[in-house]
Amino acid sequence: MKQYLELMKKVLDEGTQKNDRTGTGTLSIFGHQMRFNLQEGFPLVTTKRCHLRSIIHELLWFLQGDTNIAYLHENNVTIWDEWADENGDLGPVYGKQWRAWPTPDGHHIDQITTVLSQLKNDPDSRRIIVSAWNVGELDKMALAPCHAFFQFYVADRKLSCQLYQRSCDVFLGLPFNIASYALLVHMMAQQCDLEAGDFIWTGGDTHLYSNHMEQTHLQLSREPRALPKLVIKRKPDSLFDYRFDDFEIEGYDPHPGIKAPVAI
């Protein structure tokens, strides 16, 4: 994951000081891209320990179309707690947009099911896209989508995906986002009888929060270790039938975790 450390250094060296919605302050750059060959290992940051339980359960939660944190709490995942209301609701965030995008005539579009059908029946299409950025519902969301738009691409029986992330918390959020979408590519590929290809991450406002500087320098002082390997133990009947226990990360030997405050 040298690319990730190089991005951190670039933000430190070239970033512009900016104010932000949370009032914390950031160093920010605009526009950056990283490419991860998923055949070379699972792109999970090794210079600090990442919480795999949260990454996997959050993705499964998105795929169910869920927008209440009850499922996450049942599985000891608290990463959305700060944004939920007293009933645990988040409004029409990622899961709702992925699985039930509302149409003007009162119907809903299941973007994930549509994408699966396209990959199986029209893999050369240039329209294999999922968007979470629903401008008509942004005001109802507890948090506007950061990872907002992703596209799939098939070549030589390999499935690749490019994500556009309009806002990126490099220290806390980005390791989660990379691993989550890499996992999604592997799952989609398995369901479509393809191999995993590349995951391409493209960032808009790419920033380090001012209260993450000490942690960033500590992480940059560490040497990256070998990437782990993802093993999917079975092939469920559908993309929506995966369980947490279906996934195993082999050979993950990270440096110790580094705590940092979340900007809310």
UniProtKB/Swiss-Prot annotation:
GO biological process: dTMP biosynthetic process; dTTP biosynthetic process; methylation
Keyword Lyase: no
Keyword entries, A-Z: Cytoplasm, Methyltransferase, Nucleotide biosynthesis, Transferase
Cellular-component GO terms for this entry: cytosol
Localisation: Cytoplasm
Reaction catalysed by this enzyme: dUMP + (6R)-5,10-methylene-5,6,7,8-tetrahydrofolate = 7,8-dihydrofolate + dTMP
Active site per UniProt: C146
Binding site for dUMP: R21, R126, R127, R166, S167, C168, D169, N177, H207, L208, Y209
Pathway membership, UniProt: Pyrimidine metabolism; dTTP biosynthesis
Residues that hold (6R)-5,10-methylene-5,6,7,8-tetrahydrofolate according to the record: H51, D169, A263
MF terms in GO: thymidylate synthase activity
EC number: 2.1.1.45
Subunit annotation: Homodimer.
Family in the record: Belongs to the thymidylate synthase family. Bacterial-type ThyA subfamily.
Family annotation (PANTHER family): THYMIDYLATE SYNTHASE (PTHR11548:SF9), THYMIDYLATE SYNTHASE 1 (PTHR11548)
Protein's job: Catalyzes the reductive methylation of 2'-deoxyuridine-5'-monophosphate (dUMP) to 2'-deoxythymidine-5'-monophosphate (dTMP) while utilizing 5,10-methylenetetrahydrofolate (mTHF) as the methyl donor and reductant in the reaction, yielding dihydrofolate (DHF) as a by-product. This enzymatic reaction provides an intracellular de novo source of dTMP, an essential precursor for DNA biosynthesis.
HAMAP family: Thymidy_synth_bact
Protein's name according to its UniProt entry: Thymidylate synthase
